[in-house]
């Protein structure tokens, strides 16, 4: 057993909290306006139709509808497809 702590062990012992990033609403799910779709750092997913982008690159729905993921010219996009309600 060492009687001294060692070179850097006394400077260790910190860890940061997880950032909870990732896709929050998946393809086909119905969302309301304002719901967060993707939390990300940088634009891994780009905003498409009826999707806005926040200051921290979070994607959110700007209109109600179903979530749709797709690619265009090598970029991944998230769209909101408006669902047609039948008045019954």
From Swiss-Prot:
State any single GO MF term: structural constituent of ribosome
Keyword NADP applies: no
Q: Does the keyword Ribonucleoprotein apply?
A: yes
One GO biological-process annotation of the entry reads: translation
Entry's Pfam families? Ribosomal_L27
Disordered as annotated region, ranges: 1-22
Which family does the similarity line name? Belongs to the bacterial ribosomal protein bL27 family.
Q: Which PANTHER family does the record cross-reference, listed alphabetically? A: LARGE RIBOSOMAL SUBUNIT PROTEIN BL27M, RIBOSOMAL PROTEIN L27
Q: Kindly give the HAMAP family that the UniProt entry links to this protein.
A: Ribosomal_bL27 (MF_00539)
> What name goes with this protein?
Large ribosomal subunit protein bL27
Gene that this polypeptide is encoded by: rpmA
């Amino acid at each position: 057993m060492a009687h001294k702590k060692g070179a850097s062990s006394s400077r260790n012992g910190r860890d940061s909290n997880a950032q909870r990033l990732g896709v929050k609403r998946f393809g086909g799910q119905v969302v309301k306006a304002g719901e967060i779709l993707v939390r990300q750092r940088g634009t891994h997913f780009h905003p498409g139709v009826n999707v806005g982008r926040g200051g921290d690159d979070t994607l959110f729905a700007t209109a109600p509808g179903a979530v749709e993921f797709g690619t265009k010219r090598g970029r991944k996009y998230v769209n909101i497809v408006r669902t047609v309600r039948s008045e019954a």
